[in-house]
Amino acid sequence: MNEVPLKDWIDGGHYIEYDSQQIFVHTSGKVPNSQDLPPGANPDVDGVLIIHGFPGSSWDWAAVVAEVSKHTRVVVFDLFGHGQTSKPMEGGFEENYSLFKQADLAEAVAKAEGLHNVILVSHDMGQTIGAELMYRHDHGKLSFKIHHALVHNGSTLVNLVHLNDLQKNLLAMPDKPLDADLPRENFIEGLRGTFSKEHAATDEILNIMTDQIMAKNGSRLMPVIIRYMLQRKRNLEHWPTTLFEFKSAPFSLYWGLQDPVSVEDMCNKIKEERPSTDLHKWPDVGHWPSIEVPERISKAIIDRLNG
């Protein structure tokens, strides 16, 4: 399980400015010299870029970063409206939190951190942002190269999603910030139900995740940001088709089968439509593989670095 203290994680990061907003970025590790690479490793790969999910943050990946950064450079950042990144209150979803804008942010972070050829890792809402980057890569429009795409539980195939009560309640609210914070308990209990029985979240983990949501009055924005679900529906041909037809780099799926939201039918459908997809199912894992089984995620990434 991820046991990295939130303060240590924040202290280890830095901020860049993008679109007049402050973006929290955590970069660690370094690219090894070519003579130090294991046999079969691609010397052109210069790092790992991780895109987190909703309502998570870069902290979700702290334990993975600690291990993978022993082998290469790892960059993970807080998306607009998440964690320690700016959370603008003026304007609605399309202006501030569109998945296309989040993908632009990912490109800006990669450029700022000097990434040119990466293993792209994505989860949950980040899965769809990753799909947009994969689309751009397939069409020669991405500013960096994808060496391998590792995709984890997410509901880009939104027609198959099983929304929980918290998500349904947030989607029923207007597309504007709330006047007051939502109760912490709403998030703690909503998150608790998305972990597996074998890797149940501790109170400490749930409180850290909720702290990241509540930072900068972020809970007030949840009804706005969650409209990414509706944007997925408006782009039902665009992003799922990318996952079905991605051709410009290898593509692996790692899926926790106890996920009550991003259900097994989703990874099965991607595998059915794209048989060459490297699919790994974990029966004992829920929605948060990077928190529940970081050692497995780390191994998957390191294996892709080494061959």
PLM segments and residue spans:
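Catalytic active-site module of serine/aspartate enzymes centered on a nucleophile-bearing elbow/loop
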Residues: 276-307
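The conserved beta1-alpha1 loop
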Residues: 49-53, 255
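Conserved serine/cysteine hydrolase catalytic core
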Residues: 218-272, 281
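Conserved hydrolase catalytic core segment
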Residues: 112, 116-160
